[in-house]
Amino acid sequence: MKTSDFDYNLPQEYIAQKPVEPRDSSRLLVLNRQSGELTNRIFGEITDYFKPGDVLVMNDSRVLPARIKGIKQDTSAKIEILLLKRDGEGCWEALLKPGKRTKPGTIIDIHQKGGVVSIQAEVLADKEDGIKLLRFSDETHLMKLGEVPLPPYIHTPVADPERYQTVYALTNGSVAAPTAGLHFTPELLKRLTEMGVICTYVTLHIGLDTFRPVKEEDPKDHKIHREYGILSKETASAICCAKETGKRVFCVGTSATRLVEQASHLSQTSLITSYSGWADLFILPGYKFRVADCFITNFHLPRSTPLMLTSAFAGWPFLRKAYEKAISEHYRFYSFGDAMLIL
């Protein structure tokens, strides 16, 4: 297995620059692993594939207003901060743009819209992959000073920032949306609940690894970034109950899938128990899924870790066939793009 195996060519015009309205009007490509069939549907029709007692697991992490504009105190040059995650000791890991010449000790003034300096950020240290360690003078209003960051391949501003949040987003912490969940509407979730589907939530705060291509020739040499996750006792209980009664677990997105699989591997008393902590499970082809029976996801970037996880679930030959069909039939790709359901 080589990283180049997970490459494919995508015309730029297939990268969705804005979301469709309503959310559940996006297209849905259904992959049936048992029959080998590929079926075109609309996302709002996904209810056809659920049965009473099935469990739907969604990631309720909310995207932080993590893109913050500032001015370097020593040169008065403009600089942009992209918050990644807290380090657990009162500081933040972040990317700076431009960042190469921004050394430890640099002070960044962060202004409110009125032009008054609100807080300052100090660069404390350089870390791997261009990441900087920052400490803010005051975090009380930090989240009010930033904007929700969009993926680097989206060049069109979004009229409503809430369109880059799921309708059930609850807990601030991600720098990228759990995009498979963007297709759900409150009405669709209500229909599923009325059908007897158990809707449950986990929290996994998504980092930049979701966008970064794997650079190592052998993907097994890639070190996936850690992300913080929480899986409640109630969600674990719902999953165990479904498995014990022959029902299925549908995971929405690679983030929810990674967290439930990691929690299952760490559980010593049953299939899965509650969990809170860092998630760093790197799922590659050959992995045996313990929790996820069905999988809802978007179309992913070449050589990316989400694509590798999806390949592990569907099988890369079948998934490649699905991607070829999606490209030939003009599906929309990436964060604001269409979805697939893998049965």
Curated annotation (Swiss-Prot):
It comes from the Bacteria. It catalyses: 7-aminomethyl-7-carbaguanosine(34) in tRNA + S-adenosyl-L-methionine = epoxyqueuosine(34) in tRNA + adenine + L-methionine + 2 H(+). Pathway: tRNA modification; tRNA-queuosine biosynthesis. One of its GO terms (biological process) is tRNA wobble guanine modification. The keyword Nucleotidyltransferase does not apply. It is found in: Cytoplasm. One of its GO terms (cellular component) is cytoplasm. Keywords: Cytoplasm, Queuosine biosynthesis, S-adenosyl-L-methionine, Transferase. Its main location: cytoplasm. Belongs to the QueA family. NCBIfam families: PRK00147.1, queA. This is S-adenosylmethionine:tRNA ribosyltransferase-isomerase. It comes from Dehalococcoides mccartyi (strain CBDB1).
